[in-house]
Amino acid sequence: MATINQLVRKPRVKQVVKSSVPALNACPQKRGVCTRVYTTTPKKPNSALRKVCRVRLTNGFEVTSYIGGEGHNLQEHSVVLIRGGRVKDLPGVRYHTVRGALDCSGVKDRKQSRSKYGVKKPKA
């Protein structure tokens, strides 16, 4: 335990918390343009073709973003909205594209968890 005199001479240093989503600049979402849309394979125990896109954001950052849901309509030059949230089995993918916003359509025929995939309530 430091004495009061020691603390007067050299105060305690606050620990700096490093952001897990630096490209967002403390914003909830950011807009960007797809520069490349492709599939990639996950880490060891899993096997799939995960849909991802490279996005150039409005603040100049270029990030890799995951496209959730079954099927998508994204191609090069599509304008997308990016939110934080990493994909555990894809190294370097720290962002998600927001479905149903800007050029990214919602998931077709989605009935459950619709709000996460940009789907309106179906007519009864």
From Swiss-Prot:
InterPro entries: NA-bd_OB-fold (IPR012340), Ribosomal_uS12 (IPR006032), Ribosomal_uS12_bac (IPR005679). Gene3D superfamilies: Nucleic acid-binding proteins. GO terms for molecular function: rRNA binding; structural constituent of ribosome; tRNA binding. The modification 3-methylthioaspartic acid is found at D89. CDD domains: Ribosomal_S12 (cd03368). Keywords: Methylation, Ribonucleoprotein, Ribosomal protein, RNA-binding, rRNA-binding, tRNA-binding. Signal peptide: none annotated. Disulfide bonds: none annotated. One of its GO terms (biological process) is translation. GO terms for cellular component: small ribosomal subunit. It comes from the Bacteria. PANTHER family: 30S RIBOSOMAL PROTEIN S12 FAMILY MEMBER. NCBIfam families: rpsL_bact. Belongs to the universal ribosomal protein uS12 family. Part of the 30S ribosomal subunit. Contacts proteins S8 and S17. May interact with IF1 in the 30S initiation complex. With S4 and S5 plays an important role in translational accuracy. This is Small ribosomal subunit protein uS12. It comes from Tolumonas auensis (strain DSM 9187 / NBRC 110442 / TA 4).
